[in-house]
Amino acid sequence: MSLAEQIEQQQDDAGWSAHLQLRFVQRDGVTRLGAWKHFGPLLVQRPFYPEGAPCHVYVLHPPGGIVAGDRLELDIHLEPGSHALLTMPGASKFYRSIGPTARLAQRFHLAAGSTLEWLPQDSIFFSGARASLASRFTLEPGARLLAWETLCLGRPVMHERFDHGALDSLLHIELPDEVGLHERLRLEGGHLGKLGGHPLLATFCAAPANQAVLEQVRPLLDELGNPAGATLLGSLLVIRVLDHDNQHLQRTLQRLWHVLRPAILGLPACPPRIWAT
């Protein structure tokens, strides 16, 4: 093997891999964690049932940070009629990298009549991080979705800018008989013009939605005082918010969730206990 081939092999072997696969099923009117497999440090705590039938699960990433060459995969499958709410106790941190790109791939399959609430903490990209983030949601007929994603470039609370590094973020939401959402955001360190100079971007997606639901969220966005907007893509409601303050942005997302959960799911808000800590 040549020196160049050895270096390439070392780069490919850099970092570690982790994979978490969860399958939710409905049994006797209650959603259960029917099966789960994991490799590496991606784990889940035991399910919680603070509101009866829906299953609340916390996804854990014990090391707390993602570095050069790390590869994480999250694969979530909801069987017909099941309802799962997933969140995380902490942010996903992508640290400075001088090696291969760190990669996080998340796949969610919602079978007919199932419901997913994906409400993670933010993904923080330290200055110098090189990261790839890919999230794909596939909805079958009758499935319902409430999902948000928050990208934090740099550490605003520490006055640290994302001066160098790179982020490649993909978001796909596939709906039956509709176009859905297929987008890609590429950012280079020091060039946040696409975000109007804001270090924080949140995207909140809800389905199925209609014009009445859109009108419910617009007053909340109008009073924020920072750039925000909402639009309907068929039956998919897409909300985007820019901010300079992570805590303020998290409160905004939770307020939107308190509005959208009754509107989309017909259920009162039942915040995960971890939000109160």
Swiss-Prot record:
Subunit details: UreD, UreF and UreG form a complex that acts as a GTP-hydrolysis-dependent molecular chaperone, activating the urease apoprotein by helping to assemble the nickel containing metallocenter of UreC. The UreE protein probably delivers the nickel.
A Pfam cross-reference name: UreD
Main location: cytoplasm
Record's protein name: Urease accessory protein UreD
Keywords recorded for this protein, A-Z: Chaperone, Cytoplasm, Nickel insertion
Disulfide bonds: none
GO cellular component: cytoplasm
Organism lineage: Bacteria, Pseudomonadati, Pseudomonadota, Gammaproteobacteria, Pseudomonadales
Gene that specifies this protein: ureD
The species this protein was found in: Pseudomonas putida (strain ATCC 47054 / DSM 6125 / CFBP 8728 / NCIMB 11950 / KT2440)
A GO molecular function held by the record: nickel cation binding
Function noted in UniProt: Required for maturation of urease via the functional incorporation of the urease nickel metallocenter.
InterPro entries: UreD
Location in the cell: Cytoplasm
Family: Belongs to the UreD family.
